[in-house]
């Protein structure tokens, strides 16, 4: 039997978690070692503090005062509407293109989610989204990166953050597809961390088996710790990478390594730049960027009443207009700063139903949505915004850049996303002088063209044929 360090027992006793050892004598040596390793990695005192705070009626932050203090973001680069605006965007694009040529850019894709909500029992990145082919989300992003490499004659490392649920299958999928010709040595898979679920009533850590804590991913804010623990921040520094283009797996129309966005980020020496789009209505379920007491923050839609969401400022502009696309550019040194003190990103509480093993060793599966049995903990990457000294917000072109796949049907579904990909393709063809019926699907690989100008030139030269689109 594996001897238990007295310090471990003391910590478990102090934090009311001694139940974690209830089946220890029944476990094999390897199972004992695994359980003790999980316990050793867990900050038991912090979890106890968070649970106690979650049981208080009041919030540690005065939510009402926070919303009242919110203002429309002040430092925003809006979409161009004048010749001067267009010139500014052109100059930013040139700066961004130079950053790409100099090899200072890498891509981070957050790919920890399964496609369950789409009726797809695999990592969401493997979901086929091409309007005419079975091109997957992973393939679309890989082809964008490869096309950027070819255009700017540069290296662009691709960092893919997986979860325990998606890591193995993602690795196998990329290997089977030869990393879409990017080269295995430039694609880095790394796994986000996990945190235990707590019993909502008692604060006790739940167990999923006799030897395992009930763990769940630690949220996209776990990116910072995951990059550091995988040694990737050091690797990026060695390769002189300065800018990390961050996006989530579910948006096939994101413009990866967007030169204009990179250019504005570099010009302003921003530590954290965020792409936003104007909400379609105050009721749209999107987090929004705002200024609160001189800092950039995100207010989640769930924090706002319908009346607050529709509030306008003195100019008649919605205060809460700037919808978060989850497209960011991080300064690498800023991520290193965050990694040096992980406590800067707070843990958030979500009440969920979580299956667990009870004191008799039987599995219980709660299913009362009105009274969730557990507390899950996660970090949000956008909590880095108020920590940064220099932030920037850039308004994107919503119809071009933000068409996510989140739901099985209706808004933000595979149907709407494929329709957007086809529409963008038809618009590019129209710019090249080819009219395509609105009901005809079009699919343009990034390797055929990254934008309308490139498509026009390649159709004219014969490098791309209309029949191939």
Regions found by a protein language model. Give the residues of each.
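Generic detection of intrinsically disordered/low-complexity segments and helix-coil linkers/edges
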Residues: 17-18, 250, 396
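Residues immediately flanking
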Residues: 111-112, 249, 332
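Hydrophobic/aromatic beta-strand patches that form the interior of the parallel beta-sheet core
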Residues: 108, 127, 159, 188-190, ...
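Catalytic core of tubulin tyrosine ligase-like
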Residues: 240-245, 253-257, 262-439
């Amino acid at each position: 039997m594996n001897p238990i360090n007295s310090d471990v027992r003391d910590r478990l006793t102090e934090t009311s978690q001694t139940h974690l050892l209830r089946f220890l004598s029944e476990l094999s040596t390897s199972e004992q070692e695994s359980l003790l390793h999980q316990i050793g990695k867990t900050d038991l005192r912090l979890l106890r503090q968070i649970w106690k705070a979650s049981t208080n009626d009041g919030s540690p932050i005065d939510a009402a005062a926070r919303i009242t203090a919110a203002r429309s973001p002040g430092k925003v680069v809006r979409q161009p509407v004048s010749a001067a605006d267009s010139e500014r965007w052109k100059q930013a694009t040139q700066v961004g293109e130079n950053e790409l040529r100099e090899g200072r850019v890498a891509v981070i894709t957050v790919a920890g989610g399964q496609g369950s909500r789409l009726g797809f029992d695999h990592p969401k990145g493997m979901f086929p989204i091409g309007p005419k082919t079975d091109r997957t989300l992973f393939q679309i992003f890989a082809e964008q990166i490869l096309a950027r490499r070819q255009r700017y004659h540069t290296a662009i490392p691709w960092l893919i953050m997986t979860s325990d649920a998606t890591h193995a299958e993602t690795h196998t999928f990329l290997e089977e597809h030869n990393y879409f010709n990017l080269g295995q040595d430039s694609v880095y898979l790394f796994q986000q961390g996990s945190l235990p679920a707590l019993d909502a009533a008692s604060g006790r850590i739940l167990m999923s088996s006799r030897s395992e804590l009930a763990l769940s991913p630690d949220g996209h804010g776990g990116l910072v710790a995951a990059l550091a623990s995988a040694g990737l921040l050091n690797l990026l520094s060695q390769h002189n990478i300065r800018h990390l283009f961050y996006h989530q797996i579910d948006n096939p129309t994101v413009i990866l390594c967007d030169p204009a966005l990179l250019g504005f980020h570099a010009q302003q020496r921003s530590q954290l730049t965020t792409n936003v789009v104007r909400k379609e209505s105050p009721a749209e379920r999107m987090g929004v960027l705002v200024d609160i007491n001189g800092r950039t923050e995100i207010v989640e839609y769930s924090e706002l009443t319908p009346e607050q969401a529709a509030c306008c400022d003195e100019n008649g502009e919605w205060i809460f207009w700037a919808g978060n696309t989850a497209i960011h550019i991080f300064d690498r040194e800023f991520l290193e700063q965050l990694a040096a003190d992980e406590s800067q990103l707070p843990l958030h509480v979500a009440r969920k139903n979580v299956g667990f093993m009870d004191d008799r060793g039987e599995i219980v599966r709660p299913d009362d949505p009105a009274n969730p049995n557990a507390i899950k903990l996660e970090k949000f990457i956008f909590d880095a915004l108020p920590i940064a000294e220099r932030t920037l917000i850039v308004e994107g072109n919503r119809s071009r850049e933000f068409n996510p796949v989140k739901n099985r049907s209706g808004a933000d579904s595979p149907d709407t996303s494929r329709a957007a990909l086809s529409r963008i393709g038809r618009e590019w063809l129209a710019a090249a002088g080819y009219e395509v019926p609105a009901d005809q699907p079009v699919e343009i690989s990034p390797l055929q063209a990254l934008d309308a100008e490139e498509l026009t030139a390649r159709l004219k030269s014969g490098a791309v044929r209309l029949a191939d689109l």
